[in-house]
Amino acid sequence: MAKKSLIQRERKRQKLEQKYHLIRRSSKKKIRSKVYPLSLSEKTKMREKLQSLPRNSAPTRLHRRCFLTGRPRANYRDFGLSGHILREMVYACLLPGATRSSW
């Protein structure tokens, strides 16, 4: 089980990312726009605006975690579980449609 403080920190990052998502996306779009190109000074202002946003609001700072244990590694996106929890649940027949491999 992951420390509760790490799980809370991750939730805080998710909330910040959702809060600043539109601002970050629109300013990046304006910087990369080829239809309405910005001057160098305008691009610099937009980059400064991006840099002024909280660091934890960047989507690259997010980590997927197992929703049962909070483990940050070996997560399966389809289930939202870490590998060893997924394996235990499959063996206990708690995941419909998932079977042990045998050949």
Curated annotation (Swiss-Prot):
SUPFAM superfamilies: Glucocorticoid receptor-like (DNA-binding domain) (SSF57716)
Signal peptide annotation: none
Domain of life (superkingdom): Eukaryota
Key word Chloroplast present: yes
Membrane-spanning residues: none
InterPro entries: Ribosomal_uS14 (IPR001209), Ribosomal_uS14_bac/plastid (IPR023036), Ribosomal_uS14_CS (IPR018271)
Compartments it resides in: Plastid, Chloroplast
Keyword set, alphabetical order: Chloroplast, Plastid, Ribonucleoprotein, Ribosomal protein, RNA-binding, rRNA-binding
Any one GO MF annotation of this record: rRNA binding
GO cellular component: chloroplast; plastid; small ribosomal subunit
Any one GO biological process: translation
Chief site of localization: plastid
Keyword hit for Hydrolase: no
Family membership noted in the UniProt record: Belongs to the universal ribosomal protein uS14 family.
PANTHER family: 30S RIBOSOMAL PROTEIN S14, SMALL RIBOSOMAL SUBUNIT PROTEIN US14M
Record's function text: Binds 16S rRNA, required for the assembly of 30S particles.
Quaternary assembly: Part of the 30S ribosomal subunit.
Protein's name in the database: Small ribosomal subunit protein uS14c
Organism expressing this protein natively: Oryza sativa subsp. japonica (Rice)
Gene that produces this protein: rps14
